[in-house]
């Protein structure tokens, strides 16, 4: 029986250049996502001098900014962090759907790993739980996914 070749990404951020796209809407949540993600990446060897922080108004602007950053060729990966909280109108559904699709499109179009840390929550309590409380920190999870994907892509 032959041996299966396995490709896996190591969680080593040394030498990488990363762009972080973070929304200003719901910044009391987003700042916790950013803090957790940057702490995680630094603990895994990322030099903070190699991080470019891009602050944008909200989730709807994320695809455009991620696409521009990916096309620049300056970064190994992008981290998209934000929080959209459901209100009383369908606006939530449109913003979440288009932001998600657009971020995925930028990732695929440019073969650029993008850590997807856009919270889409029904209420503030859910957002708080996902930004470092009961449900962990989704910014950390997005950073880990981005890092592992960068290292996998290097081997393909």
Swiss-Prot record:
Gene3D superfamilies: Lumazine/riboflavin synthase. Keywords: Riboflavin biosynthesis, Transferase. Its EC number is 2.5.1.78. Disulfide bonds: none annotated. InterPro entries: LS, LS/RS, LS/RS_sf. The keyword Transferase applies. Pathway: Cofactor biosynthesis; riboflavin biosynthesis; riboflavin from 2-hydroxy-3-oxobutyl phosphate and 5-amino-6-(D-ribitylamino)uracil: step 1/2. Signal peptide: none annotated. It comes from the Bacteria. GO terms for cellular component: cytosol; riboflavin synthase complex. (2S)-2-hydroxy-3-oxobutyl phosphate binds at residues 88-89, 130. The active site is at 91 (proton donor). 5-amino-6-(D-ribitylamino)uracil binds at residues 25, 59-61, 83-85, 116. GO terms for molecular function: 6,7-dimethyl-8-ribityllumazine synthase activity. It catalyses: (2S)-2-hydroxy-3-oxobutyl phosphate + 5-amino-6-(D-ribitylamino)uracil = 6,7-dimethyl-8-(1-D-ribityl)lumazine + phosphate + 2 H2O + H(+). GO terms for biological process: riboflavin biosynthetic process. Pfam families: DMRL_synthase. Belongs to the DMRL synthase family. NCBIfam families: lumazine-synth, PRK00061.1-4. Catalyzes the formation of 6,7-dimethyl-8-ribityllumazine by condensation of 5-amino-6-(D-ribitylamino)uracil with 3,4-dihydroxy-2-butanone 4-phosphate. This is the penultimate step in the biosynthesis of riboflavin. This is 6,7-dimethyl-8-ribityllumazine synthase.
């Amino acid at each position: 029986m032959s041996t299966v070749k396995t490709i896996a990404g190591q969680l080593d951020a040394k030498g990488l250049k990363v762009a972080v796209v973070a929304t200003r809407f719901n910044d009391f949540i987003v700042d916790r996502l950013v803090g957790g993600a940057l702490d995680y990446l630094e603990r895994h060897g990322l030099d903070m001098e190699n991080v470019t922080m891009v602050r944008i108004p909200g989730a709807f602007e994320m695809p455009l900014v991620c696409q521009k950053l990916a096309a620049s060729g300056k970064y190994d990966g992008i981290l998209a962090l934000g929080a959209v909280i459901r209100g009383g109108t369908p606006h939530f559904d449109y913003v979440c759907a288009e932001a998600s699709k657009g971020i995925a499109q930028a990732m695929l179009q440019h073969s650029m790993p993008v850590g997807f840390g856009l919270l889409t929550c029904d209420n503030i309590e859910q957002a708080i739980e996902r930004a470092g409380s009961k449900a962990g920190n989704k910014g950390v999870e997005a950073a880990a996914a981005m890092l592992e994907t960068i290292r996998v892509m290097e081997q393909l």
